[in-house]
Regions:
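Metal-dependent amide/peptide-bond hydrolase catalytic core
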Residues: 25-193
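Fold-level recognition of mixed alpha/beta catalytic cores in primary-metabolism enzymes, strongest
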Residues: 1-29, 33, 42
Length: 193
């Protein structure tokens, strides 16, 4: 979580404030430069700003802005590089607009990438095809970037992470998601194979 602390004020007097929204907005854009210019393009990494909160009124410059940032990498080295670059950009972006910033890390949400072993992925693929699934929809090559507890198991036990899908409805993280009750029958059949 990043908090950009500015100086609030009236929207008609921006020269008497330090606008944290402007500083944080610039930061959102600058964060993408880390992936584009600091990370090896052959080393998968993602930075997501999943939440941006600030202010409540159209005519008031708020005193602070908060960003929640998610980082996904496949290597610890890249994760550390991104962490250092985020710290630098947060500090510099805040200072550029007369603000200050604080970063709070939650180390409990740092997950390793997951990897499917070829033999287990083939087993899942074969069962999916046997059950009438589209083979193209069950392929998962390379690491996956989800924050998934199962990745800790995969560090020790060769395995395959997969999803059954939800049919034609919206996907899991969509606000309109509706669980497909047919999965209550399909899931156990799949696992039983």
């Amino acid at each position: 979580e990043v908090t950009v602390q500015g100086v609030g004020g009236h929207g008609a007097l921006p020269h008497m404030a330090a606008d944290p929204i402007v500083a944080a907005s610039g930061l959102v854009l600058a964060l993408q430069s880390i992936i584009a210019r600091n990370v090896d393009p052959l080393d998968p990494a993602v930075i997501t700003v999943g939440s941006f909160q600030s202010g409540a009124l159209a005519t008031i410059i708020p005193g602070e802005a908060r960003l929640n940032i998610g980082v996904r990498t496949c290597t610890r080295g890249t994760r550390e590089l991104i962490r250092k670059r985020i710290e630098t950009l947060v500090s510099m972006q805040a200072k550029a607009f007369g603000c200050e910033a604080e970063i709070i890390y939650n180390p409990g949400i740092s997950y390793p990438p997951g990897y499917n072993t070829p033999e287990h992925a083939k087993l899942v693929h074969d069962v999916a095809v046997e059950l009438g699934q589209d083979p193209a929809r069950v392929e998962m090559r390379g690491p996956f970037m989800f924050s998934e507890d199962f990745a800790f198991i995969q560090e020790v036990v060769p395995s395959c992470y997969f999803g059954l899908g939800n049919g034609k409805s919206r996907s899991l993280h969509d606000s309109g998601y509706d669980f497909n009750d047919e999965l209550l029958v399909k899931g156990p059949v799949f696992w039983g194979r």
